[in-house]
């Protein structure tokens, strides 16, 4: 089997480069009645067009606008933990694009992808957070779908210890081609390739392609229970895990308040959750889990310790509204795991 550990003597100047949708999150708190009126399934992610995005924006109140996107959130976490990260994604040169660039750059994450001057506006995700901390997302992908192979900074892809890919990109053919090109370059450069399945509906749309992708390119897989069971067309999590063991060396399956299941060298290891306060918003839990996990791996730590780092980061972010935190994450890791990263 391929060794998924990162050699501590690796002198790469970059820990992780991520490719994903460059999105601005627009968060608002609401109750179940609004979701029912809008015919949204609580906890789901729905793709919407620009007109619908404008309509929903107008009915939201007490908005919090933050740079977002699943992989971008993970990279921001890595940077906050002292890692060196870079992001590849497309925004337009509009107001939301400025917000995205300013905030992702403020975390220390490298962002050099050229902006679009024409075409769709910057992507946004309207996130409705209910009192039970569930988030229902409506996403307008906008300029993010314009990502194509020529946008790749090949030197960065070759340099980073880990390439992290966002499953949502599979919805757009040009972005999908960029995705595959980056994975091939990373593998040919001796780097590790990680994938987030992103969303159960995304998995359903592209199940066959994802299964091939996991088998051919992926060293590290992130998914939640709904996504991994969707991948293997089953309602039985244990069955899905057994299938995954045959195809993937290292995977982390998050199971909400029950923590996560680490799959490493064919073994299952339960990673307990870290409850660091009352959960008020689960928006960034999976993203920060992946960020902490990848930071640990890039430092040469074991998969178990890396998963625990991810669990602490996830346990912290659910106590905040949104998917970014200004807290000293490294200090939290030292406090709860007694290690310095």
Functional labels for PLM-detected ranges:
Residues 75-84, 128-130, 296-299:
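Alpha-helix C-terminal capping segments
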Residues 85, 111, 193-194, 251:
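Hydrophobic beta-strand scaffold residues
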Residues 2-17, 22-23, 36-42, 184-185, ...:
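Conserved phosphate-binding/catalytic region of the ribokinase-like
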Residues 112-116, 127-173:
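Conserved phosphate-binding/catalytic loop of the ribokinase/pfkB sugar-kinase fold
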Residues 103-120:
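A glycine-rich helix N-cap at a beta->alpha junction
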Residues 162-242, 258-260:
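Conserved beta-alpha-beta core of the PfkB/ribokinase-like small-molecule kinase fold
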Residues 2-88, 98-99:
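Glycine-rich phosphate/adenosyl-contacting loop at the front of the ribokinase-like
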